[in-house]
A protein has these predicted regions:
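Extended, low-hydrophobicity segments enriched in charged/polar residues
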Residues: 9, 16, 20, 27-169
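A contiguous, surface-oriented mixed alpha/beta subdomain in the mid-to-C-terminal portion of proteins
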Residues: 94-255, 260-267
Length: 269
């Protein structure tokens, strides 16, 4: 027998609310028992299209490192950038003049590092870094020397606890830093690190240094008449830098008298 959609006894009607309709596996419908009050206060706990209210801020913007030097000075580190990086020279930045002119100084501040490598200053924000600009110094009310001192102090503290990897193959030896923290290449700025590499590698030959990317510092001892090692070292630096997300330099350097200079010997094949 066919079902009559207008017969209430058969579960259907086209008049009023159809409470008795068979919804199968669907959830039972919800019906309003009153018209909505559009002027009523919004219920903060009521979800809207799956939206979850944002967490309540526990601090003001003025307390973030970008605005508070007392917090920033514990988080700032030096970092290398490729030669040719467009930045504002830190030695030319004048805090008093920048404060007086009111102009924006959004370009990253850069120092000249060893072998002409640019050095910027980065705020460690965890998943990313904030590169320090002149606007930051103006907001913090500090000079370039304060920034440099804090960054080197933090790098030194971190480096003192960071491990080294030592690899030996016959008479060949590599010492490298690849912690993943992001400050490995910058370790070469520290006198203690230069002393360490000189002690470990210096007695056996020339000390080759590679800074292919931000996360790697590699050093090797080049013994006399081992040109093959120099070529292999140069190839590694070239390939690593070419595939890096944050490359620094494809050149091979060496330590001479405690100074980082460009290696004038064998180049990559």
């Amino acid at each position: 027998m066919e079902r009559d959609p207008f017969d209430r006894d058969q579960g259907g009607s086209n008049v009023g609310r159809d409470f008795e309709r068979d919804h199968g596996d669907e959830p039972a419908p919800a019906f309003r028992d009153a018209a909505p009050d559009y002027l009523a206060p919004i219920d903060d706990d009521a979800p809207v299209s799956g939206h979850t209210p944002a967490p309540v801020a526990t601090s003001s913007a003025s307390e973030t490192p970008e605005h508070d030097w007392q917090r920033a000075k514990e988080l700032v580190y030096p970092a290398f950038r490729p030669v040719g990086t467009q930045c504002e020279r830190i030695e030319s930045f004048d805090l008093m003049a920048a404060t007086a002119d009111g102009k924006s100084h959004t370009q990253p501040l850069v120092d000249e590092g060893p072998a002409g490598l640019p050095v910027v200053y980065a705020l460690d924000a965890g998943a990313f870094d904030v590169i320090v600009s002149g606007d930051h110094l103006r907001t913090w009310g500090i000079g370039a020397a304060d920034l440099q001192d804090a960054a080197m102090r933090n790098l030194s503290t971190w480096s003192a606890a960071a491990p080294w990897t030592d690899e030996i193959s016959g008479e060949r030896r590599l010492v490298s830093s690849d912690t993943g923290d992001g400050w490995d290449a910058a370790r070469i700025l520290l006198p203690d690190v230069i002393d360490h590499l000189t002690r470990e590698l210096g007695p056996h030959g020339r000390i080759l240094i590679g800074l292919p990317e931000r996360h790697i510092l590699v050093a090797g001892s080049l013994r006399p008449n081992d040109d093959e090692f120099a070529s292999l070292f140069a190839d590694f630096v070239l390939e690593t830098s070419g595939g890096a997300d944050e490359p620094i330099d494809r050149r091979v350097f060496e330590l001479v008298g405690g100074r980082l200079v460009e290696f004038a010997g064998i180049v990559a094949r």
